[in-house]
């Protein structure tokens, strides 16, 4: 049997030419950094360096930082991405040249109307949306929302107590994920849910689908390898966000607006109501109200951006406290002294608790939810005396910087004292960036810290956390783009009432 197909000469020539053209496409940009004398990992045809992310972007960035120093080049498919780690360079990108050159984040996936979301929007559209939304994240607005969040602090304690009373170790992500989801839906949409006990609630089920991304899936890889497919997918109305979830929230926002226009009753404060209310003010050249589509995009993105920030960080904090019982005890002492008899904190008191702040900051140093900060240049630019063309991506490997021994003695150790008042002054704000930096930093930073700190206070007022045989020590991190443990964190949870009775 002839194993080689009997094609005509013309067919063989066409096939050979196609392979040559494919190879040229697959490698045409891969000499970009070599010409500039910038080191970096060798890219593969078509894929660039993305297959190296299989062990985790955080791991890849640490290895590159150790091997190549303060600057290196990599390729996401054919796209060149410059990695920088020097504080002066980082400041130039995130602050000094934010509006002129590095206004926009890298966004390569088809997003449909979600392109209007704050995190994805670009240039003047982003500036206008950011200005509109900033007034909803002031400390005054967060104080208005604090009673809602307090309510879910009690639900969190109740749910965890029910699990702890079973006498078995507790998988934390399910409990903390429910707390995060409940708060997001309540503060974004004004809807009360109990996602742990009602997982089939449509709000819960539709919201849960929004952050189920696999960035190494064939669909998303196709966009990385063939960037032109993004436009094709957009034309075909194909998005990385699940259509049924988008349709559900579209209908809800439309119905909420209709009720908002018809009702004069005072509504419970939530971000959707605040955005709808802002449409009542007269537009000016510098103050144009959000459109209905823009409001919808922000509402949905609150879910995407907020869920992992709270739930995963809470898991990492409790793991760190369980493996460092001296730190846990010291934090409980601060909480008990500041809030005797399990008193509920006020917003201001909570934000002034020094050791609580130290513990949260050190956890965010070790486990920043996002591994990287990325920008896309909209003009030609210079860094370190070298010229780069418009469209070059710039990446800051925040996880690698948070674990850099140049800035952090014994960087893999959990030491809240790094963030004491005395030591905090020595921390470079362009090295420690759990929420980014500059005009395009995370707008929800205060909200995230409020949710984290309230949960921590209520948890440690009521429980102590211990390692058990199911606890993975040392903790291994997963390969997801958003930082998570490789395996769920499981701890023994003991009511402090029992501890006191048994003392």
UniProtKB/Swiss-Prot annotation:
Keyword Methyltransferase: no
Inducing or repressing factors: P450 can be induced to high levels in liver and other tissues by various foreign compounds, including drugs, pesticides, and carcinogens.
Gene3D superfamilies reported in the protein's UniProt record: Cytochrome P450
Enzyme class: oxidoreductase
Gene Ontology BP terms: oxidative demethylation; steroid metabolic process
Family annotation (CDD domains): CYP3A
Membrane protein topology class: Peripheral membrane protein
Residues at which heme binds: 442
Domain of life, source organism: Eukaryota
Keyword Membrane carried by entry: yes
Record Pfam families: p450 (PF00067)
InterPro entries registered for this protein in UniProt: Cyt_P450 (IPR001128), Cyt_P450_CS (IPR017972), Cyt_P450_E_CYP3A (IPR008072), Cyt_P450_E_grp-II (IPR002402), Cyt_P450_sf (IPR036396), Cytochrome_P450_3A (IPR050705)
Family: Belongs to the cytochrome P450 family.
Function summary: Cytochromes P450 are a group of heme-thiolate monooxygenases. In liver microsomes, this enzyme is involved in an NADPH-dependent electron transport pathway. It oxidizes a variety of structurally unrelated compounds, including steroids, fatty acids, and xenobiotics.
PANTHER family: CYTOCHROME P450 3A5, CYTOCHROME P450 FAMILY 3
Protein name: Cytochrome P450 3A17
Gene from which the chain derives: CYP3A17
